[in-house]
Amino acid sequence: MSQEVLEDLAKVRNIGIMAHIDAGKTTTTERILFYTGITHKIGEVHDGAAAMDWMAQEQERGITITSAATTCFWGGNQINIIDTPGHVDFTVEVERSLRVLDGAVAVFDGKEGVEPQSETVWRQADKYKVPRICFVNKMDKIGADFHFTVKTVVDRLGATPLVIQLPIGSESTFEGVIDLVEMRALTWRGDAKGDVKMGAEYAVEPIPEDLKQQADEFRQKLIETVAENDEALLEKFFSGEEITVAELKSAIRRLTVSGSLYPILCGSSFKNRGVQPMLDAVVDYLPSPLDVPPVTGVDADNPQERLADVSQPFSALAFKVAVHPFFGRLTYIRVYSGTLPAGSQIVNSTKSRKERFGKVFQMHSNKENPVPKMSAGHIYAVIGLKYTTTGDTLCDQDNPIILESMTFPDPVIEVAIEPKTKADQEKLSLAIQRLAEEDPTFKTEQNPETGQTVIKGMGELHLDILVDRMRREFNVEANVGTPQVAYRETIRRTVEKHEYTHKKQTGGAGQFARVIITLEPLEVTGEKTYDFVDTVTGGRIPKEYIPSVDAGIRDAMQVGVLAGYPTVGIKATLVDGAYHDVDSSEMAFRIAGSQAFKEASRRADPTLLEPIMSVEVRTPDEYMGDVIGDLNSRRGHIQSMQDSSGIKVIQARVPLSEMFGYIGDLRSKTSGRAVYSMTFDGYAEAPKSVTEEVVRKARGE
């Protein structure tokens, strides 16, 4: 089959593989590439040679950090795969890949079931309404339990699973699956070391006698579940007619695409069993670009949509920028509509800049296959885009549209970084600029007082890897400080009608602005941390100056009155004020707004907020007391404790400032047998002792 891009979109699948760390996601992707004939020797993550893990650190750490996009062919269909990382510090990668996928394969560990990170990724996929099929991997592992894993999909994700395969054998005797749709057994029989043919061939057999009864029960359940959700089949089901395989498949497809059900398959990627049927399921049940609702523009006054069709005007979303060793900036884009040859000029409608595409590639991990043009429904990597960053829309100059972008969380941890020599200084700023283009959750700023460069990210591992990349890719030698917590400030009390007058009379034009503001605490939500209300009547402050007061307050909120951290949770009401015909200006009102806020917030009982992390620890029973005692000593609140296949799962909320270096302590307390994961949960008021300590440090006492 030629490697050209398929024009028939019904035969195209854009999918992601999502999972918890170590559920076997990269291995699964490797097997897919092997069976679809792109990689000749299977890369094993165990020896650090997987084709998808192409950054040096990924190969060392055995975890996937960047989502490499890969194209492969299966049975006349084209599958574009985006491999996503499962480590919580890399949520941004998962978030951006889900935004451009049409469907996903959720890989679960057959022994652990749904783990905390699988849950986070699952919720992100819910947010973008991505249809999914589930693959229960590692069925050859000791303690693997298919039915337990299916139960965790119900209990922890609240999803409706649809079991379409059952395992034949388990642990070391796992040798195949029962296909409940076509009622047959698929077996991969090899020698004890695993088949020399890499499991590329499998036998289709009748279902073994000892499993027939179980298979019949599950087949009945499968048909009932599908019929309940699909009217066409419901009538047939009640009238006792035979439902054909084709009818069952198309009903499962409809329900999967609409997100009502999640088909569940099983296998062992490492032992090369069960991967081909999973590829068949990707083609059979996951949506093509034609099954997905058309994309719409975000401009409410001018609603527009684009269908996945080459005859429509061109539109695409940039979802990743990577730095390539030869080509420089490589931008990954998902084309939603239209077609364009390489070298065309387009508009970046998000930034209102003209751009030109250079060469266009379909990627295989980090090898490029050049293609002459881009067309709807596909994923490409392009070079030549100068201004485009993650989340920008690219479109036809005459038919502009802006597509929904992605939301990225604010960083929660920061470290100061200093170049070791003068020569490193320039390299450092280039490295930071390049890395920030690639990763929107990586922020950087100059500390005005110390002149230090501060880098911010989503966790210790995230920053470690970024500093590591600076060293490897940009040869920057730098000293890194200890991690600091990104605190916030807020107010606890309402201050009514605080007045501030800004005036300056020094010959020539003076400056004059009077404002009266009321400050109230505002509940902080993900989207809203500040609200500005204007209740000035009778033109006491001319309309054109009011945005300046708002801007002044925003300026002042950047540096809080307690310890200089950004202020959140403020509702500011501009009640009244006064102006002068000659001396008032936007600048004067901006200064007045800023100073009024500073004075009022000092009176409003300011307090410090600290980031709280949601921590989940999985530990063997005998260490449970130590682990809980340790979490309590870190000011943690234990939320729940559960049993999960011989392991205790502890959920707690712990302040981030207490979690530095936790991994080392946990390892030594549990002889390396416990694991933990941590996600940002929100901000909470810091206790008095912590606030005093932070304020003292900030004031340099």
UniProtKB/Swiss-Prot annotation:
<dbReference type="InterPro" id="IPR020568">
    <property type="entry name" value="Ribosomal_Su5_D2-typ_SF"/>
</dbReference>
<keyword id="KW-0963">Cytoplasm</keyword>
<dbReference type="GO" id="GO:0003746">
    <property type="term" value="F:translation elongation factor activity"/>
</dbReference>
<feature type="binding site">
    <location>
        <begin position="19"/>
        <end position="26"/>
    </location>
    <ligand>
        <name>GTP</name>
    </ligand>
</feature>
<dbReference type="Pfam" id="PF00679">
    <property type="entry name" value="EFG_C"/>
</dbReference>
<dbReference type="GO" id="GO:0003924">
    <property type="term" value="F:GTPase activity"/>
</dbReference>
<comment type="function">
    <text>Catalyzes the GTP-dependent ribosomal translocation step during translation elongation. During this step, the ribosome changes from the pre-translocational (PRE) to the post-translocational (POST) state as the newly formed A-site-bound peptidyl-tRNA and P-site-bound deacylated tRNA move to the P and E sites, respectively. Catalyzes the coordinated movement of the two tRNA molecules, the mRNA and conformational changes in the ribosome.</text>
</comment>
<dbReference type="InterPro" id="IPR035649">
    <property type="entry name" value="EFG_V"/>
</dbReference>
<dbReference type="InterPro" id="IPR009022">
    <property type="entry name" value="EFG_III"/>
</dbReference>
<feature type="binding site">
    <location>
        <begin position="137"/>
        <end position="140"/>
    </location>
    <ligand>
        <name>GTP</name>
    </ligand>
</feature>
<dbReference type="Pfam" id="PF22042">
    <property type="entry name" value="EF-G_D2"/>
</dbReference>
<dbReference type="InterPro" id="IPR005225">
    <property type="entry name" value="Small_GTP-bd"/>
</dbReference>
<dbReference type="GO" id="GO:0005737">
    <property type="term" value="C:cytoplasm"/>
</dbReference>
<dbReference type="InterPro" id="IPR035647">
    <property type="entry name" value="EFG_III/V"/>
</dbReference>
<feature type="binding site">
    <location>
        <begin position="83"/>
        <end position="87"/>
    </location>
    <ligand>
        <name>GTP</name>
    </ligand>
</feature>
<dbReference type="InterPro" id="IPR041095">
    <property type="entry name" value="EFG_II"/>
</dbReference>
<dbReference type="Pfam" id="PF14492">
    <property type="entry name" value="EFG_III"/>
</dbReference>
<dbReference type="GO" id="GO:0032790">
    <property type="term" value="P:ribosome disassembly"/>
</dbReference>
<dbReference type="InterPro" id="IPR053905">
    <property type="entry name" value="EF-G-like_DII"/>
</dbReference>
<dbReference type="InterPro" id="IPR000640">
    <property type="entry name" value="EFG_V-like"/>
</dbReference>
<comment type="similarity">
    <text>Belongs to the TRAFAC class translation factor GTPase superfamily. Classic translation factor GTPase family. EF-G/EF-2 subfamily.</text>
</comment>
<dbReference type="Pfam" id="PF00009">
    <property type="entry name" value="GTP_EFTU"/>
</dbReference>
<dbReference type="InterPro" id="IPR047872">
    <property type="entry name" value="EFG_IV"/>
</dbReference>
<keyword id="KW-0342">GTP-binding</keyword>
<dbReference type="GO" id="GO:0005525">
    <property type="term" value="F:GTP binding"/>
</dbReference>
<dbReference type="InterPro" id="IPR005517">
    <property type="entry name" value="Transl_elong_EFG/EF2_IV"/>
</dbReference>
<keyword id="KW-0547">Nucleotide-binding</keyword>
<feature type="domain" description="tr-type G">
    <location>
        <begin position="10"/>
        <end position="290"/>
    </location>
</feature>
<dbReference type="InterPro" id="IPR031157">
    <property type="entry name" value="G_TR_CS"/>
</dbReference>
<dbReference type="InterPro" id="IPR009000">
    <property type="entry name" value="Transl_B-barrel_sf"/>
</dbReference>
<keyword id="KW-0648">Protein biosynthesis</keyword>
<dbReference type="InterPro" id="IPR004540">
    <property type="entry name" value="Transl_elong_EFG/EF2"/>
</dbReference>
<dbReference type="InterPro" id="IPR000795">
    <property type="entry name" value="T_Tr_GTP-bd_dom"/>
</dbReference>
<dbReference type="Pfam" id="PF03764">
    <property type="entry name" value="EFG_IV"/>
</dbReference>
<dbReference type="InterPro" id="IPR014721">
    <property type="entry name" value="Ribsml_uS5_D2-typ_fold_subgr"/>
</dbReference>
<protein>
    <recommendedName>
        <fullName>Elongation factor G</fullName>
    </recommendedName>
</protein>
<keyword id="KW-0251">Elongation factor</keyword>
<dbReference type="InterPro" id="IPR027417">
    <property type="entry name" value="P-loop_NTPase"/>
</dbReference>
